[in-house]
């Protein structure tokens, strides 16, 4: 089973939250209103949090209400330039799970600018967003030895 995440924008805090879609939801969006978002400083994720769920390839932090560490990012209201996307984020995140070198933060930033926010801009959103990816996840993966699919496009 590939990991699936959904995006929720909190305009009050200028934060885009990525959340894993639970195995029990079978691909449907997470229940609850879009306005229900975690506090600005979420508590630390317990090491066994979400271990009972069967999403192969996700680190345990993926089941936090704040979303997986590697995909948490904040946004600013101005984006100076539009950068061409690099279409290999799934491969990059797979390499991260294996401990291999991956894209720079700048490349990941470009990917999200073009692929996540493109639709909003094409629909006439006036707010332009710049993405900052936070790295350094301290959580262990729940899968082994099968290949890990940390993220797949829909």
UniProtKB/Swiss-Prot annotation:
Q: Which organism is it from?
A: Hepatitis B virus genotype B2 subtype adw (isolate China/patient4/1996) (HBV-B)
| Described purpose of this protein according to its UniProt entry | Multifunctional protein that plays a role in silencing host antiviral defenses and promoting viral transcription. Does not seem to be essential for HBV infection. May be directly involved in development of cirrhosis and liver cancer (hepatocellular carcinoma). Most of cytosolic activities involve modulation of cytosolic calcium. The effect on apoptosis is controversial depending on the cell types in which the studies have been conducted. May induce apoptosis by localizing in mitochondria and causing loss of mitochondrial membrane potential.
Name assigned to this protein: Protein X
Q: How is it modified after translation?
A: A fraction may be phosphorylated in insect cells and HepG2 cells, a human hepatoblastoma cell line. Phosphorylated in vitro by host protein kinase C or mitogen-activated protein kinase. N-acetylated in insect cells.
Asked if Transcription is a keyword of the record, the answer is yes
- Identify the keywords attached in UniProt to this record, alphabetized: Activation of host NF-kappa-B by virus, Activator, Apoptosis, Host cytoplasm, Host G2/M cell cycle arrest by virus, Host mitochondrion, Host nucleus, Host-virus interaction, Modulation of host cell cycle by virus, Transcription, Transcription regulation
Record flagged with keyword Transcription regulation: yes
One of the protein's GO biological processes: DNA-templated transcription
Question: GO CC terms for this protein?
Answer: host cell mitochondrion; host cell nucleus
> How the protein assembles, per its UniProt entry?
May form homodimer. May interact with host CEBPA, CFLAR, CREB1, DDB1, E4F1, HBXIP, HSPD1/HSP60, NFKBIA, POLR2E and SMAD4. Interacts with host SMC5-SMC6 complex and induces its degradation. Interacts with host TRPC4AP; leading to prevent ubiquitination of TRPC4AP. Interacts with host PLSCR1; this interaction promotes ubiquitination and degradation of HBx and impairs HBx-mediated cell proliferation.
Where are the annotated segments for Disordered? 28-48
Cellular localization per UniProt: Host cytoplasm; Host nucleus; Host mitochondrion
